[in-house]
């Protein structure tokens, strides 16, 4: 059986990762991984990606084709674009409905496996010492705080140990991020990825809105 000290530390590490990355990002990542597997929505998700690329390509070709100079080509591209957009919107609506159900289930499981497990451990082991401190090492009131709420006096409780783990993990993460920025002179990979995703979403929205007006 793993040490309770290690279990609490790993649990706090998972909570820190989820809070840093963001619950929505975790849900999106799991949704992408879910669609990589042979699931009921994997085919629709792959088709949506293909349609998304086709819409951007067709919109670009439409912009480069003059209806006055080459109307037949422009009309053909316009029909293809409208057809792809209609199919994409239909599939996207269906996928969003499935994703909402998936996200709700994942959020429940994630909460039970992190916050819920933490509450259970803190309640179940509230009277158990994580470890003992040398006698007389700290004043009485410090011993009382470290054993809060119900651990034996002179020991460190699971609540205090969890707080200590969370603080150490947070400080280590901030130090690592600061060193990364100082050494590479670049934003952290997480910040760079969020910026890239934001730019891609804005680019697709810019291509989609004019098409909706044409419809």
Curated annotation (Swiss-Prot):
TM stretches of this protein: 5-24, 111-131, 156-172
Name of the coding gene: get1
Annotated function: Required for the post-translational delivery of tail-anchored (TA) proteins to the endoplasmic reticulum. Acts as a membrane receptor for soluble get3, which recognizes and selectively binds the transmembrane domain of TA proteins in the cytosol.
Intervals, Lumenal compartment: 1-4, 132-155
Subunit structure: Interacts with get3.
GO MF annotation: an example: protein-membrane adaptor activity
Organism of provenance: Pyrenophora tritici-repentis (strain Pt-1C-BFP)
InterPro entries in the cross-refs: Get1 (IPR028945), Get1_fungi (IPR027538), Helix_hairpin_bin_sf (IPR029012)
UniProt name for this protein: Protein get1
Compartment(s) where it occurs, according to its Swiss-Prot or TrEMBL record: Endoplasmic reticulum membrane
Cysteines joined through disulfide linkages: none
This protein's GO CC annotations: endoplasmic reticulum membrane; GET complex
Residue ranges that the UniProt entry lists as topological domain Cytoplasmic: 25-110, 173-215
Membrane topology annotation: Multi-pass membrane protein
Family the entry assigns: Belongs to the WRB/GET1 family.
Coiled-coil residue spans: 45-96
UniProt entry keywords in alphabetical sequence: Coiled coil, Endoplasmic reticulum, Membrane, Transmembrane, Transmembrane helix, Transport
Region: Disordered, residue numbers: 192-215
Gene Ontology process terms (BP): tail-anchored membrane protein insertion into ER membrane
